Amino acid sequence: MSSRNQRSRITSSFFVSFFTRTILLLLILLLGFCNGARTNTNVFNSKPHKKHNDAVSSSTKQFLGFLPRHFPVPASGPSRKHNDIGLLSWHRSSP
């Protein structure tokens, strides 16, 4: 009887170790396919993909989908037209 118990222990321990090894192997293989395991760290891609059939795609015509690019952004410094002080600004007809 003792040999029978010993065989069942060996068989059950072999099955448990085989089962855990298989689960660990599958887990390691599946982790490689997750998006969090990417090796590429360029998450924020600043250059949009260009379409081959379009000369200029719609994503390059606008800034974040709100402002068209052909309108220039005004400078933050003082302009001659609005911020001149003195008599020169009174007589000057063009900026």
From Swiss-Prot:
<comment type="function">
    <text>May be involved in floral abscission.</text>
</comment>
<dbReference type="GO" id="GO:0005576">
    <property type="term" value="C:extracellular region"/>
</dbReference>
<protein>
    <recommendedName>
        <fullName>Protein IDA-LIKE 2</fullName>
    </recommendedName>
</protein>
<feature type="signal peptide">
    <location>
        <begin position="1"/>
        <end position="35"/>
    </location>
</feature>
<dbReference type="GO" id="GO:0010227">
    <property type="term" value="P:floral organ abscission"/>
</dbReference>
<keyword id="KW-0964">Secreted</keyword>
<dbReference type="InterPro" id="IPR039639">
    <property type="entry name" value="IDA-like"/>
</dbReference>
<keyword id="KW-0732">Signal</keyword>
<feature type="region of interest" description="Disordered">
    <location>
        <begin position="75"/>
        <end position="95"/>
    </location>
</feature>
